[in-house]
């Protein structure tokens, strides 16, 4: 049974279920409207009366909401399963799959497909990403006989050809829009690989059906409405027939609550539900995509689709005291996240109250982590010395050595941290987390990169294609700090670009008893984020707050700070604690205040208190997320 924990003055304004029809929706009475307005007014007044000190540890189900003016996040709880995503309808679709005996992997795929329908600006089967899967308890079959988490890298790849570097150097805009910006999509291949290993509680068709139905007719949700209101997308969206037919249902760009249809995309999902991914990589859909990409200036062949393969391997990990953190390897930023946690381990931050000094150390760890990120690349294209360097960066001794360089009294200019190359800033993405009653967990991040990817939609199958080639470095280009682009991230046939994505699953390692019996690690949390280069700073900050005793909703909603070394600025969200801010300024940090909705990272996660059975889920209000549980 799902419990929604909220303060008594807050009224959940949930979107309708995915099968709601506008003709049958109940009408709100005038009396109800008045009551809602009164409750909102009372809530607004109480917000200003709430303290802004750190949230205390919550030991029961009565939790405060974060005192922000935006809609608060929901904290849901259940003992059988939780799905946390950026869209209420998609979280519910995932829970419905779990209720039908689906696994966490089944539910994660169903949820991700749904997000690709209703929030197609950030993800979809025309994109790719990374996931970490923790196998279920008691599984004896080969893929999960060990409970060691695995990672699936379904990042997009560069099509065959040696002209991308020269084309992007001559005209960098070609890496952002049009056919040359498109990498070979990996999402469906990644989903099939996950389903074959850890899915099957429900059929492949059952996983796809809710999104097929949804694509035929759905209302514009808050996240999509925000993106569609951005005037930067209007010029091209209003001039392309295939986009007009979907996003201009009333001869204007759709707005919140408008009903839109994606019938071509629904048919494509139906084909994949009936026949698997073969049509997408080897058949008619693949040929349609090849033709569309090339018509928009690309140079791909059917062979580029036919040869695409996801990469399945053991997840990489580090320990932070008694917590085992599992994530995805390069070219994701999982290794960089682990490096930051290794830097911070010496301070045992979780054993002490949150202080201004702890915030300074956190910022410094980010600056060193982003310096290390400039040496990231696709391992398949790295030589032995480059691979050894990446192994060193992930290691405990290197993290400790780096932590000893942190000065508790001051910060430094970027050159002190010795970045080797310039930093490529990526964008977009969606994240979701799922835990089921079998003890399996999935942390999945997917993207089409910039809003609506390459701005190319196939007119026949409705697939919106990524612009992932924009995440590569351009040879010969230097940035404003005279740092040149990284040769480790140049576009080469088959290569996957560097990404900020870093989904994590964290277990607690119980002390082993003296009698020699083994105590299995206990699930602690699954976290991940959307938001480009702000992703892993948001994940680390949220994880630290969970370790400080915050409940999940508070850990996610608390104002954040972010530093990516270049530019040498600490980006601080409004409502951040003023005493912490003053301390950072006193140590020489350059502060830039940002609106909570500008350049945001959105965290969607699941948490379990140690030695308890209840799972808690929360989705970030920065992207209007709503979780579900039962």
List PLM regions with ranges.
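Short, low-complexity, Lys/Arg-enriched N-terminal segments of secretory-pathway carbohydrate enzymes
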Residues: 1-28
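Terminal signal-anchor or tail-anchor transmembrane helices
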Residues: 30-54
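Noncatalytic scaffold domains of N-terminal-nucleophile
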Residues: 48-51, 55-96, 104-275, 280-282, ...
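Internal maturation/activation junctions in enzymes
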Residues: 61, 251, 349-448, 461, ...
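Alpha-helical support elements that line or immediately flank enzyme active sites
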Residues: 97-98, 189-197, 275-282, 287, ...
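Active-site rim segments in enzyme catalytic domains, especially the processed small/beta chain
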Residues: 117-140, 148-151, 299-301, 440-517, ...
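Short, small/polar residue-rich loop motifs at catalytic or cofactor-binding pockets
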Residues: 312, 426-429, 451, 499-501
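Extended C-terminal subregions enriched in glycine
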Residues: 495, 539-540, 548-598
